[in-house]
Amino acid sequence: RDSVASRGLGDVYKRQAESETPVLCEAKRWLDIYFSGREPDFTPPLHPVGSAFQQAVWALLLEIPYGETTTYGTLARKLAEKQGLTHMSAQAVGGAVGHNDISLIIPCHRVVGASSSLTGYAGGVDKKIKLLELERADMKSFFVPKKGTAL
């Protein structure tokens, strides 16, 4: 009988670890640090796929410090400034934020609505709250709107 139980789980985990790529190992290490309640001091190698506009928005998300938040409007103003524009739509920025497939490492949970409303997280507002609490963000002024998702 050569069952998993008789071989021990160590063999299973060892084979799994041997098959992981360096990129996956780095991402796993980042996630382990993050979910232990500490700020990772590195960003694993990322290759998000999206339009030039989405890439620009996601780059701004990576600049939001651990435990802090910003608004869609602030991101729109920063992006407009970087691109030499007078105005950028917060809704357009919100759309790009919403298409972020690496939503934990590229921290879209740190973006809130204009009036400190907790809106627009693909994993659900309850998860957004938990992630911000894990980062020890100051949650006093935030609220979950009863209707709408004003950016």
Report residues per predicted region.
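N-terminal positively charged helical leader segments and presequences
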Residues: Q16-A17
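Long, low-complexity, charged/polar intrinsically disordered regions in eukaryotic proteins
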Residues: P22-G37
